[in-house]
């Protein structure tokens, strides 16, 4: 195994959008491949036709590309070990299943779903673990042949079951969990490797594909631990060398401590949703990488190259990874602030699209509006956790208040508030150049004239000018709001004092 080239795979089913957990699996395999100058294979496991959705494969690929994950072989790129869709490999599976049947490792099973259900109920009544009961137990070869002939005469379609060796322990050195041992007697008996419709099951197809595609390492979620002994049994039957396995811990909701489930609506769980909200791909790459993997040192922000250089599966956590929404927002904010410095046009484009989608700006804005939006976005960059947040953050420019809140009235109840506002309004009306620099100047003039400073100066001016107690830099906010709107706001406030 040590001499084998590093080849890993990400093998999604096209059953929907890219989930956070699956994105993490893809990302860790990508980092492992790139760190070792290895190969990443994208394989589409689409044998469960009932669960496949239209454009599911396309959606997976688009979101992987958006995250910055590229692969070396796959259905869109080809390679020496294709086809890379399981639905196109049925002839391969059929041939190998026949080999197992011919050698006695597998057999036709005609037990109906009703019979299997009755078996499970009887086992439950006996306080036994659910398991498949061998239907040909105690039969001679002739009796077995007669039973099969009778089933066929009834028009029953068989499944193919793999004969799991009992009283055997399957062990492997897991690169995440360490040594794992599972007793074959706990596996539920002989398991299906080919369904009645002729399609292979997951546990069979994945073994065949991993072997034929020369996969050296399998990094996947620890919900697959129970599948591993079944897969090892198939490797043994063929005499194939299995890959090295590594099973990553599950992801839990940091707020509830429960396993992250697709039914948990308190957390957005699909990459597509974060794209639509204006999360940046590099930020998502960074955050997801730290879900269950620890870098050297205390830093939390890394470039992709730094992650590739550091990545070692031995640093994958043995404890569940906590999905912390606030932490994700913090990480994305760091990238937004960096993007404002390195590529402000990209950030502008994303945020402008959100403003248009929310109906805050016309769908075909003129150059003056675009420049105004550019200044607005720059004003809120430090506060923005994701670009779709811009409409809510900047609501003072779009949602006009018509009355003061109780808290605002309390702030303006001070004897100094009215003279400060009146002095400010007078100077705003007379201001020749209405820009942030000049506005900052008249605020200082009001300070000198009224002898009021600090909160008692700035809070009345902010409330009067913007109808809000809080916001970004005051002078810049007033400039973007415009003289006419500011004076309307001032008149509204003074009318309520």
From Swiss-Prot:
Q: Does the keyword Ligase apply?
A: yes
Q: Which SUPFAM superfamilies match?
A: An anticodon-binding domain of class I aminoacyl-tRNA synthetases, Nucleotidylyl transferase
Keyword terms of this UniProt record = Aminoacyl-tRNA synthetase, ATP-binding, Cytoplasm, Ligase, Nucleotide-binding, Protein biosynthesis
Binding locations of ATP: 262
Q: Which Gene3D superfamilies match?
A: 1.10.10.350, HUPs (3.40.50.620)
Task: Show the PROSITE patterns listed in the entry.
Answer: AA_TRNA_LIGASE_I
Query: What GO terms are given for molecular function?
Result: ATP binding; glutamate-tRNA ligase activity; tRNA binding; zinc ion binding
**Catalysed reaction equations from the record:** tRNA(Glu) + L-glutamate + ATP = L-glutamyl-tRNA(Glu) + AMP + diphosphate
Entry keyword Metal-binding: no
CDD domains for this protein: GluRS_core
Please report, in chain numbering, the residue ranges of the motif 'HIGH' region: 12-22
* One BP annotation, GO: glutamyl-tRNA aminoacylation
- EC number(s) reported in the record: 6.1.1.17
Motif 'KMSKS' region covers 259-263
Gene Ontology, cellular component aspect:
cytosol
Q: Where in the cell is it found?
A: Cytoplasm
* InterPro entries, alphabetized: aa-tRNA-synth_I_cd-bd, aa-tRNA-synth_I_codon-bd_sub2, aa-tRNA-synth_I_CS, aa_tRNA-synth_I_cd-bd_sf, Glu-tRNA-ligase_bac/mito, Glu/Gln-tRNA-synth, Glu/Gln-tRNA-synth_Ib_cat-dom, GluQ/Sye
Q: Which NCBIfam families match?
A: gltX_bact (TIGR00464)
Q: Which PANTHER family match?
A: GLUTAMATE--TRNA LIGASE (PTHR43311), GLUTAMATE--TRNA LIGASE, MITOCHONDRIAL-RELATED (PTHR43311:SF2)
Function noted in UniProt: Catalyzes the attachment of glutamate to tRNA(Glu) in a two-step reaction: glutamate is first activated by ATP to form Glu-AMP and then transferred to the acceptor end of tRNA(Glu).
Q: Which family does it belong to?
A: Belongs to the class-I aminoacyl-tRNA synthetase family. Glutamate--tRNA ligase type 1 subfamily.
> What does the subunit section of this Swiss-Prot or TrEMBL entry state?
Monomer.
The name this protein goes by in its record: Glutamate--tRNA ligase
Upper lineage ranks? Answer: Bacteria, Bacillati, Bacillota, Bacilli, Lactobacillales
The UniProt gene name for this protein comes to gltX
């Amino acid at each position: 195994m040590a001499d084998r080239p590093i080849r890993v795979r990400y093998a999604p089913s096209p059953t929907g959008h890219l989930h956070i957990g699956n994105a993490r699996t893809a990302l860790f395999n990508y980092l492992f491949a790139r760190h070792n100058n290895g190969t990443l294979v994208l394989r589409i496991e689409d044998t469960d036709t009932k669960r496949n959705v239209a454009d599911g494969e396309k959606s997976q690929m688009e979101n992987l590309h958006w995250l910055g994950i590229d692969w070396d072989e796959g259905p869109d790129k080809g390679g020496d070990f294709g086809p890379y869709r399981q639905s196109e490999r049925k002839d391969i599976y059929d041939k190998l299943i026949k080999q197992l049947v011919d050698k006695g490792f597998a057999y036709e099973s005609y037990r109906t779903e009703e019979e299997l259900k009755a078996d499970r109920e009887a086992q439950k009544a006996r306080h036994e673990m659910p398991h498949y009961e061998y239907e040909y137990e105690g039969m001679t070869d002739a009796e077995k042949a007669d039973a099969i002939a009778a089933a066929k005469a009834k028009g029953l379609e068989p499944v193919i079951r793999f004969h799991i060796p009992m009283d055997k322990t399957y062990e492997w050195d897991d690169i995440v969990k360490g040594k794992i041992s599972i007793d074959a007697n706990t596996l539920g008996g002989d398991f299906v490797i080919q369904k009645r419709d002729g399609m292979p099951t997951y546990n069979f197809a994945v073994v065949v594909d991993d072997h034929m595609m020369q996969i050296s390492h399998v990094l996947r979620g620890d919900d697959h631990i129970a599948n591993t002994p079944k897969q090892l049994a198939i490797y043994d039957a063929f005499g194939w060398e299995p890959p090295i396995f590594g099973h990553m811990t599950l992801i839990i909701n940091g707020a509830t401590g429960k396993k992250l489930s697709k039914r948990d609506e308190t957390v957005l769980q699909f990459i597509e949703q974060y794209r639509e909200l204006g999360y940046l791909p590099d930020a998502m790459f960074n955050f997801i990488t730290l879900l269950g993997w620890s870098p050297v040192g205390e830093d939390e922000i890394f470039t992709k190259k730094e992650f590739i250089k550091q990545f070692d599966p031995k640093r994958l956590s043995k404890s569940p990874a906590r999905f912390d929404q606030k932490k994700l927002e913090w990480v994305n904010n760091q990238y937004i602030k960096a993007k404002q410095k390195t590529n402000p046009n990209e950030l502008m484009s994303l945020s402008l699209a959100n403003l248009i989608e929310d109906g805050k700006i016309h769908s075909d804005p003129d150059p003056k509006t675009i420049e105004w939006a550019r200044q607005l976005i720059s004003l809120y960059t430090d506060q923005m956790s994701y670009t779709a947040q811009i409409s809510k953050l900047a609501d003072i420019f779009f949602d006009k208040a018509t009355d003061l809140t109780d808290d605002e009235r309390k702030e303006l109840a001070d004897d100094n508030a009215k003279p400060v506002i009146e002095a400010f309004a007078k100077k705003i009306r007379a201001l020749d150049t209405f820009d942030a620099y000049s506005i900052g100047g008249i605020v200082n003039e009001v300070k000198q004239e009224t002898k009021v400073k600090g909160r008692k100066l700035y809070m009345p001016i902010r409330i009067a000018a913007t109808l809000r107690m809080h916001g970004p830099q005051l002078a810049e906010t007033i400039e973007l709001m415009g003289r006419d709107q500011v004076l309307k706001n001032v008149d509204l406030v003074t009318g309520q004092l």
